[in-house]
Amino acid sequence: MGDWGFLEKLLDQVQEHSTVVGKIWLTVLFIFRILILGLAGESVWGDEQSDFECNTAQPGCTNVCYDQAFPISHIRYWVLQFLFVSTPTLIYLGHVIYLSRREERLRQKEGELRALPSKDPHVERALAAIEHQMAKISVAEDGRLRIRGALMGTYVISVLCKSVLEAGFLYGQWRLYGWTMEPVFVCQRAPCPHVVDCYVSRPTEKTIFIIFMLVVGVISLVLNLLELVHLLCRCVSREIKARRDHDTRPAQGSASDPYPEQVFFYLPMGEGPSSPPCPTYNGLSSTEQNWANLTTEERLTSTRPPPFVNAAPQGGQKSSSRPNSSASKKQYV
């Protein structure tokens, strides 16, 4: 029961990271092969060598005739077929587990770097490198890995290997045994003294079992080919969508503008219906306001007494530094 539990865990892991056709193939593989071989295979082929009888008393003749009739037992041949066909799937599962562990380590390292109080350039470069590596691992919202990039390549190679192995084992079974189990096998091999007739037990039941396993093998091969077509269509549709998005992206802005469209705020440069003129101070222009200030200052100066009445200016002394009215007017103008 422990072995079945281990196989069940492997089945769950592979089904989570497979396509719809791949899940159907796994169902065919585990139900119609493992269960049939485990439950009915031993009961049908258990007496294969013990009930193989030949019409001779020569010692060793029955063994060599059985070896000639069955170079490898059917049940062992199907077990080898199951192991070889399942190996590419297990390799793909190992790649999935490796990417999952790597994604977890990258997230943990990213959290440790973001928790640091100081952000020096080395930390920023390390975070950028981690984000670049995590971008290569496509993870869905539910935590499963998407079949993209390197994982897609591994998956396609595994399906190709399964198809080749499936076709090879079907051809080998046809070359070794054919499609039916004959009730009488004619043997002529040393140390048999002459042509010997050997008899197989339950040939009709074994013929039905052989045909059933051949049909299961053909179904598995067809499913593998359908999965290859499905993956090819998926990659082509994704490439077409990416090119379409790339072509429609520059159409959002002008063709001559290489920069993305941005929003800028401009101040009104002239008067218009949407921008009323700015009101002036007291309705006067700047020149008129300067003249008004100059007149007020002269009026205040004429009414104020001079600060030094007793100090008469001498001959060589300079005059007052206040400019005359014409100079002031020029200054203010």
UniProtKB/Swiss-Prot annotation:
It is a multi-pass membrane protein. Residues 318-333 have a biased composition (Low complexity). Its main location: membrane. The chain crosses the membrane at residues 21-40, 77-99, 149-171, 209-231. Highly expressed in lung. The keyword Cell membrane applies. Pfam families: Connexin. Coiled coil: none annotated. Residues 1-20, 100-148, 232-333 are cytoplasmic. GO terms for biological process: blood vessel development; calcium ion transport; cell-cell signaling; endothelium development; response to pain. InterPro entries: Connexin, Connexin37, Connexin_CCC, Connexin_CS, Connexin_N, Connexin_N_sf. GO terms for cellular component: connexin complex; gap junction. Belongs to the connexin family. Alpha-type (group II) subfamily. A connexon is composed of a hexamer of connexins. One gap junction consists of a cluster of closely packed pairs of transmembrane channels, the connexons, through which materials of low MW diffuse from one cell to a neighboring cell. This is Gap junction alpha-4 protein. It comes from Rattus norvegicus. The gene is Gja4.
